[in-house]
């Protein structure tokens, strides 16, 4: 499926974006190995998260999926209750699922194969294979990419590990393995990354120690069931935040969005660029802060993106670069080489698409330089990347003519009702097949 957009006359209204993808992954995994029943409200029913649910079900976890209410009811099997799956576990397009499951499965008393789609089979796994091997895991992989064959070892040993890059997925993988290891596992980060795993471990009553840059867990503990309500995903909200910011006449409110400080890079950077964003009704529930976000149109200026904001914005850069494309002046992003090993090479994909829409964009090995200008209509390729697809749908709100975005089926991995909500606030996005359009 493709997206076809036409320029918007302005966004308005109030919407609630779906539940946070990162928290959904972690919540169902921890609930599955907890003792007792956990109800998960606000679960993201996207393809990535449902791949995690399916994997846990194949290992014996009882998970009732109430899809139309975004609810899971999970009967935990306890720390030692998982069973060998009958076949390879298919993680679909989800790098988070395969990396979290690798940590969980490294310490089990059975062997497992983890695989995924063609995109996932190009994603780098050496970053988890090396530290898990130090803990005593044995993992076979050709070229350090999936499929991964994990030979479970119930006698893992805790390690002290310095992450070479700020990565919440790698950190979480090792913390999960640490739950099954003898002794203490401590992870030190070069910069803060999203901390949902740490917050959820606390929510499920598991003891951990944390300071500014390190997190430690000791093996042998238990997780206790605890109902959880998942806030809206700020990565999904970011598309509407940018769309309203760049489109004249816009004013929207996004309700009950997760505003975890380790995820606020996109708001921090947009405010540096001059955005009019107001965060209100701040509350904290289930260890996670939430708030309403009101956004009004504003004129933006280009900036040099501070390195400390890069890990806090890593998933939102595609749409942030759309904001940079219409800002006055130059925006420079560096220290973001991680963008090249996402679902696609996001640096190359964004530079390619922006150039096709008339924007001066230059690729760097670890980032991009964008000279703000005027978006023209045209046709771009999402390269089967959900965030690239939605980012260029946002570009279409302000472009001088229609924008066609190719290969958007993967939006279902993270935001199944994106088109519906986009049109609800006035973005004019249509899903089309063949050469149809508006």
Curated annotation (Swiss-Prot):
InterPro entries: Enolpyruvate_Tfrase_dom (IPR001986), Enolpyruvate_Tfrase_sf (IPR036968), EPSP_synthase (IPR006264), EPSP_synthase_CS (IPR023193), RNA3'P_cycl/enolpyr_Trfase_a/b (IPR013792). The active site is at 315 (proton acceptor). Its EC number is 2.5.1.19. Phosphoenolpyruvate binds at residues 21, 95-96, 123, 169, 346, 387. The keyword Transcription does not apply. GO terms for biological process: amino acid biosynthetic process; aromatic amino acid family biosynthetic process; chorismate biosynthetic process. GO terms for cellular component: cytoplasm. It is found in: Cytoplasm. Disulfide bonds: none annotated. Gene3D superfamilies: Enolpyruvate transferase domain (3.65.10.10). It catalyses: 3-phosphoshikimate + phosphoenolpyruvate = 5-O-(1-carboxyvinyl)-3-phosphoshikimate + phosphate. One of its GO terms (molecular function) is 3-phosphoshikimate 1-carboxyvinyltransferase activity. It is an enzyme of class 2 (transferase). SUPFAM superfamilies: EPT/RTPC-like. The keyword DNA-binding does not apply. It comes from the Bacteria. Pfam families: EPSP_synthase. Keywords: Amino-acid biosynthesis, Aromatic amino acid biosynthesis, Cytoplasm, Transferase. Residues 93-96 are annotated as: Phosphoenolpyruvate. 3-phosphoshikimate binds at residues 22, 26, 167-169, 315, 342. PANTHER family: AROM/DEHYDROQUINATE SYNTHASE, PENTAFUNCTIONAL AROM POLYPEPTIDE. Homodimer or homotetramer. Belongs to the EPSP synthase family. This is 3-phosphoshikimate 1-carboxyvinyltransferase. It comes from Coxiella burnetii (strain RSA 493 / Nine Mile phase I).
């Amino acid at each position: 499926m493709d997206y076809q957009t036409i320029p918007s006359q302005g966004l308005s209204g109030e919407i609630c974006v779906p539940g946070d993808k990162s928290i959904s992954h972690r919540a169902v995994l921890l609930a599955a190995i907890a003792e007792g029943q956990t109800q998960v409200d606000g679960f993201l029913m996207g393809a990535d998260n449902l791949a995690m649910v399916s994997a846990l079900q194949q290992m014996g976890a009882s998970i009732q999926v109430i899809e139309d209410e975004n609810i899971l009811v999970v009967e935990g099997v306890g720390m030692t209750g998982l069973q060998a799956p009958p076949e390879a576990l298919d993680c679909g397009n989800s790098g988070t699922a395969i990396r979290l499951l690798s940590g969980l499965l490294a310490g089990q008393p059975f062997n497992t194969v983890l695989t995924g789609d063609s995109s996932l089979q190009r994603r780098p796994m050496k970053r988890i294979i090396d530290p898990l091997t130090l803990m005593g895991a044995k993992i076979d992989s050709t070229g350090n990419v999936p499929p991964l064959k994990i030979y479970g070892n119930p006698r893992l040993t805790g390690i002290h590990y310095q992450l070479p890059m700020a990565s919440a997925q790698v950190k979480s993988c090792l913390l999960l393995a640490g739950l099954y290891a003898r002794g203490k596992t401590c992870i030190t980060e070069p910069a803060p990354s999203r901390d949902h795993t740490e917050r959820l471990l606390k929510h499920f009553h598991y003891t951990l120690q944390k300071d500014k840059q390190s997190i430690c867990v000791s093996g042998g503990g238990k997780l206790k069931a605890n109902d959880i309500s998942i806030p809206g995903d700020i990565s999904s909200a970011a598309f509407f935040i940018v769309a309203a910011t760049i489109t004249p006449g816009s004013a929207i409110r996004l309700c009950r969005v997760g505003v975890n400080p380790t995820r606020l890079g996109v708001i921090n950077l947009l405010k540096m660029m001059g955005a009019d964003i107001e965060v209100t009704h701040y509350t904290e529930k289930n260890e996670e802060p939430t708030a309403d976000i009101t956004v009004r149109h504003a004129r933006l200026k280009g900036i040099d993106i501070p390195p400390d904001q890069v890990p806090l914005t890593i998933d939102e850069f595609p749409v942030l670069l759309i904001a940079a494309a219409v800002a006055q002046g130059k925006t420079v992003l560096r220290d973001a080489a991680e963008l090249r090993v996402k679902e696609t090479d996001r640096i190359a994909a964004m530079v390619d698409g922006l150039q096709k829409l008339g924007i001066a964009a230059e690729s760097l090995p670890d980032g991009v330089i964008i000279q703000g200008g005027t978006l023209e209509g045209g046709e771009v390729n999402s390269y089967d990347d959900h965030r690239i697809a939605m980012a260029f749908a946002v570009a279409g709100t302000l472009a001088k003519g229609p924008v066609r975005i190719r290969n958007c089926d993967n939006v279902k991995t993270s935001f199944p009702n994106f088109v519906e909500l986009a049109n609800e606030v006035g973005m004019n996005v249509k899903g089309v097949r063949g050469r149809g359009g508006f």
